[in-house]
Amino acid sequence: MSRPEILAPAGNREMLGAAVFSGADAVYLGLTGFNARRTAGNFTPDELREAVAFCHARGVKVHVTLNTLVYDRELSGLADAVRAVAAAGADAVIADDLATAQLVKSIAPTLHLHGSTQMSVHTPEGAKELAALGYDRVILARELSLEEIRAVCEASPIEVEVFVHGALCMSVSGQCMMSAFLGGRSGNRGACAGPCRLPFDASAGLKPGQPGRACHLSLKDMDYIPHLRELMDAGVASVKIEGRLRTPEYAAAVVTACRAVCAGQPYDEKLVRDIFSRSGFTDGYLTNRNDGKMFGVRTEADAAATRAATPKARELFRRELQRVPVHYELSGGVEDGGVKLTARDDDGHRVSVYSADEPQPAQKDPLPGIERALGKTGGTPFVMDGLAAEPGEGGFGFLPGAAWNELRREALDKLLEKRSEVTPHAVQAFEMPTYPAHTVGQLPALAARFANAAQCPAEAAEKLQYLIFPITEAESIPEAWRGKTLLELPRVMFGRLEQKTAARLDALQDAGFAGAVVNNPAQLRYTDGWTLYGGLGLNVTNPMSAARYASLGVQGMLLQPETALTAMQAVAPGVPTAALCYGHLPLMLTRACPLRNVRDCGKCPGGGTLRDRKGRDFTVTCSASGGAGVRTVFNPVPLYMGERLRELPVDVAVAAFTTETPARVSQILDLLFNAQPFDSEFTRGLYYTNN
């Protein structure tokens, strides 16, 4: 089995040096703006060029994160960012939005394109779809088991990258809106405030309004370092360390540990644990142990351990790691009046230097001493990998040790300088497409999403343009409704759910349904013959990504709920667009169950609540018990736009019902049909912000 790339975080220049000096094969870093860690130090275009030169000189690749959702007003700036990455000579772009992918392929097609974990790709068909879209690598969701990772690796035509150490988001990446709707800072836009680390308490017996105290949404850091050999065997091409917001010492400690395990050597487990943990680590997802032991918080004892471990970790990157093989060629000698030393690497770089001093006849064989002098490469990234000696007439002769040392230094300095030369990617001319704006002021048609058929009032079904139901409810939908019913596919499909979903679609092909709502790129591969609409999971926020999905056969799409009305107006891809007009927004989609902190699945009624520090209750629903199930955490206050429907610049307004009773559904639909104000507490979400 081949050793995977060790990919380390570089949140700033110091962390970059620590990652490289401790042995990372590649680093990932953010260009200022457009990356999922906007609060990291990040790099300007000039700093990026310097970083690439530094890394490439040492045989280290640079992956640049442009992995946030973008709005129409930002597309020109994003195109400039792609040009900056190409000019810097970086190796790859990590992209989330399909607009970013399109810009990379249009502007700098030789740049490698990696599908961010924010795309929520986690299945074999998802990897195949990214390959079809032009991606060179898929970065899998963190929630997968070893068996699921292996299945993707075996099926994937492109490289597979997995996270192996660092912070675990509670939500599936790309499917979290908690920070945006609770604090106005979108994780999908690189500004997550980490609200899941605050108290969200699943404990029973809390009095109404009593603040929650337990942090039941806070997962321990993941640690798959002990499992690296298994991941290598599974076919993983790159193992990624999370942590651009952490310290250089953290990066060095984890990189060093990964290198040791990949080489079959022991590593300092205590140092890895002490440099950062949240009451220890978890490998629950990888090993199929989805239980309460996955959760933990950062304690004062953890912080004290980090302070104590930091000096030791700092020693790991005090000096250059000698990793770049250098081959020497030596010629000339006494009769030639000097010697010529050539240094070359395996990448085709070659430099030559000449002795300033004239050699004198040697009393003994000088070659052993010459080899010792040329092998002293400490303090450089080079390691001697052979000497080809071709002495002239009279032999090499004698030169003092200082002269050989100076020759070596001069040769290696020149070779390092040559390796540091940046090779930009060719940039193609690209004119940003223009997109029409959506008309404002027209009344959108009404559609509604229901959790099940019993929740939908018969009289409302006749008045709504579309009815949307989970595909699991298909058989219970009355035939009279099917002509206007769209079957909603799952946003995530763990275990065997992808195969089951594809099989169910095949079985329902001729059952009279109006279409299917796709929520993951994977689903584009097994929905042939269906009229397709894009759902919440596609995260469409701009006209370029909307147009790309339309070109892939999507005939209408729900815009991402964080999108402000002004940004929505710019999304008019030539197919109908939709926006939520009512609903308790799904703030998180999780595989780990927060309720497992207080009870096991056998004692669970299929859901529960979480109490935050302000005394508010967040409903949690569960699709199935165990690791195959998905939990959804809902906002306690519903979004409502009933009396402002004309302000939604879309064709269809969608009311999303979850746990409401049929009677309550009827009341809310009446308010919407009559454009009436809401009858209880509500929110306008982020529609009127300038996000």
Regions found by a protein language model. Give the residues of each.
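Glycine-rich, highly charged phosphate/nucleotide-binding loops
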Residues: 43-48
